[in-house]
Amino acid sequence: MLQLSHYPSAIAQAAQRVNEVDSQLMAVQHQINRFEGNADRISAFESDLKNDAQRKARRFEVLLVNQEYQKSMDTLIRLTAEKQNAIAHLEYLRNQFSVAKLEARLAIVQQLNDFEARELVGL
């Protein structure tokens, strides 16, 4: 457990990590959207595709062979898990900070009670 005075900076660092991962996630999602838009464009303008089901199948084929798209999807999955872990760590630090503050308050109350008890006894 950290010292009480170290929690705010640790919490700020953990929140910054969540923001960094979130930023990376948005960049990867933007890249995925571009790949999907390109696949939509390719499938929309192929004249031999006669219905929506054929266009969807062609879109799927285009995305399936795109290695960059596959890498981006893997990165998206990894970053999503990383973000969830970062959020869990942030919440853990916040909860630890709350517990540390309560323990500090309890220690102060116990010291005051001990002091008052000694005064009553006349020590």
Give, region by region, the residue ranges found by the protein language model:
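N-proximal short alpha-helices
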Residues: 1, 5, 52-55, 59, ...
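Intrinsically disordered, low-complexity acidic Ser/Thr-rich regulatory segments
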Residues: 59-76
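Extended alpha-helical coiled-coil "stalk/arm" regions
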Residues: 24-63
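Long amphipathic alpha-helical coiled-coil segments
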Residues: 22, 29-36, 71-108
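Generic detector of low-complexity/intrinsically disordered segments
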Residues: 65-66, 104, 122
